[in-house]
Amino acid sequence: MIDVSVLICTRDRGASLSRTLDSVTRAVGVAGDMAVEMVVVDNGSTDDTAARLAVWQEEQAFPVMLLAEPRAGLARARNLGLAHVRGRIVAMTDDDCVLKPDYLLALVRRFAGVATPTIVGGRILPGDAADLPVTLKLEDHPMEPVPGAFPGGFVMGANLAFTRDVIARTGRFDTRFGAGARFVAAEDTDFLFRAIAAGVVVAYDPYFVVEHHHGRCRPDEVIALLAGYGYGDGALYAKHILTDRRILGAIRRDLGDALREIRAGTRPFPYIRRFHSFRLRHMLRGFFAYAGHGLTARVRLSNAHEKA
């Protein structure tokens, strides 16, 4: 029986991926007799990723499965990987992350005795001092989400682990969300949102750790990233607003944050004068884009039925 399946999806990051894979090899070596498999999904790379993966696979003493998903989209790639994992625990990280050597040992300790569908996010530290401080999770103590709160940012897909039975309870990732998809982000938040609604236990644990070498060194790169996050969250709000009251609570919180920011004249984010207003603007874009997409789809379906 496989104890842990490590799932990584990659696209055109050959050099970065090699660093990630080497960290997996080290972590497996430290893990002793733990049964670990590696599942890598190449999401349409056009660089030397395939060649690097083939060489690395031959060098490993543990099972490595290489899959290809040519259709763009991180959620699509993850879904393909999830259809093939065999481990009791699935550990997802990104192709620009590096696992700490004791990652697998700490992960298995956290899930020891867990008997119900459970998701646990791990710590994400900066990998390069030149990178700006985004897409990190720095808290050094275990946490649980606030009941009824919107889970965005509580844990992140760059270091996310769960028992394999979570998939049957929650469903797979929504392929309309995430990198490479129509709504560019929030695929992990949507997954968490549905999981919590389905009764899955969600928690944060700081003891299984990755370093994130995201490479964003300029403010304009960070601003574009945060605009995408807002856009994705807005689309997620539109997806769930009619069926889940947590969305209304999240909207009230976002509006309150923006008003307090305007009144106080504070600048919570160094590169954006009014961050919460900036976020609201891009959330509105995402909200109406999702609503318009849904309306278009319904019209097409109606027209198809009329012609049938």
Q: Residues of each region from the PLM?
A:
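N-proximal low-complexity "stem/linker" segments adjacent to membrane-targeting elements
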Residues: 1-26, 33-34
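Acidic donor-binding loop at a coil-to-helix junction in glycosyltransferase catalytic cores
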Residues: 155, 179-193
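Short, flexible, basic/aromatic active-site loop/helix in glycosyltransferases
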Residues: 122-123, 136-155
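A conserved acidic beta->alpha catalytic loop
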Residues: 13, 23, 42-51, 97
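Glycine-rich, basic loop-to-helix element that forms the pyrophosphate-binding segment
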Residues: 69-85
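Short aromatic/hydrophobic "clamp" motif used to bind/position activated sugar donors
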Residues: 90
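Non-catalytic, C-terminal membrane-associated alpha-helical segments of glycosyltransferases
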Residues: 224-231, 238, 242-308
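Conserved donor NDP-sugar-binding/catalytic core segment of glycosyltransferases
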Residues: 102-134
